[in-house]
Amino acid sequence: MRQEATCSLVLTQDAQHRKNQPPLAEEDDDRDHTDDAMPPPCSILLRQEEGEATAAAAGEGLLVPPLNFAMVDHGVYRSGFPDISNLPFVESLRLRSVLCLCPEPYPEANQEFLRAHGIRLFQFGIDGSKEPFVNIPEDRIREALKVVLDVANHPVLIHCKRGKHRTGCVVGCLRKLQRWCLTSIFDEYQRFAAAKARVSDLRFMELFDISSLKHLPASFSC
């Protein structure tokens, strides 16, 4: 009985205390509760930080291909001139050979890279002149094609400065050896040359005589 009386007294006093409290101001009910929002749990913050760190690390190891890089066939690639930032990507191709169509001396940094990875350099300098009536040296195109046709040089990367005209002519003549129709050859050339396609290049590929070179199957992988 004494315990029940004590509990009743406590409840009565608590009720009386709340009754005597002043009412809450109305502005408390209308206040903006955005400040009361709970901060995100630590686990979420940690996951966000880990994600940002992973993305940064991935960015540092990103492989950047050279301008106009593409696979021509099994073991044959084409591109513009690889610069220093492209060398990690070039390394991933595990090349045996590089075929350069520029007449200028090959950069020392690129030569060091080739030596370090046991990659052989073939260079057949072709003038990159934009003059419409400058003849394309057919003999150098033929020598370049012989390098590409020798599977002992594969994987091989063919490149000029931009990977458009000189590289496009070599690849176009290679396609003739693979028995591509001219429409498909021209379409591939224009895909890389775009608005800078040259009529002289198209004419050269059309008239190029493949009789002295061995013909290929549809693909080097055959």
From Swiss-Prot:
This is Inositol diphosphatase DSP1. It comes from Oryza sativa subsp. japonica. It holds the Pfam family Y_phosphatase2. Keywords: Cytoplasm, Hydrolase, Nucleus. It is found in: Nucleus; Cytoplasm. Residues 1-41 are annotated as: Disordered. Residues 1-14 have a biased composition (Polar residues). Induction: Induced by 20% PEG (polyethylene glycol) 6000 (to simulate drought), ABA (abscisic acid) and NaCl.
